[in-house]
Amino acid sequence: MHKKSHKDVDARWTKKRGENHYGYKNHIKADKKTKLIEKYHTTDASVHDSNVIKPLIEEKDKGQDLFLDTGYESKEDIVKECGMNPIICEKGHRNNPLTDEQKQNNRIKSKDRCRIEHIFGFVEGAMNGSLVRSIGMLRAKAANALTNLVYNIFRYVQINNYQPQLITCKG
């Protein structure tokens, strides 16, 4: 009778680096300069990151660069359709490794993209934010919203203490 309260019917399984994970994903769009999370979208764990581009892109993003990893290679057209410039690291394939020039280009692209990866590192390491211990999509969305809010507060304090010139008031 009360089985539904003990079983999460919204969560799904996924495999990441050979490890199985059950639950939800927190997809984010963040500012490269400040590392503040601007927008987020919660999905079950089985949804691939590349399928959640459109919900994160806004009208104000048109004309800007969007840094993506190699998993988004097939979604380049969607990013262009949204009016953004996709910056995607190239990927080597079997019997067709990357050239030295491609490796150099990837290094340049990765310098900007890694700033966003720092967010996930902080959320997972310092905040234990990769775990959502609730049942249901609605509660997972709320948990991710709070995690992202707390991260932004931490980040705002860091910016205010060490780089106050990045904080601008828009009146």
Regions found by a protein language model. Give the residues of each.
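Polybasic low-complexity intrinsically disordered regions
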Residues: 1-70, 75-80
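Short loop/turn segments at secondary-structure transitions that flank enzyme active sites
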Residues: 34, 92-94, 155
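A short, flexible helix-boundary coil/loop motif
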Residues: 130, 158-171
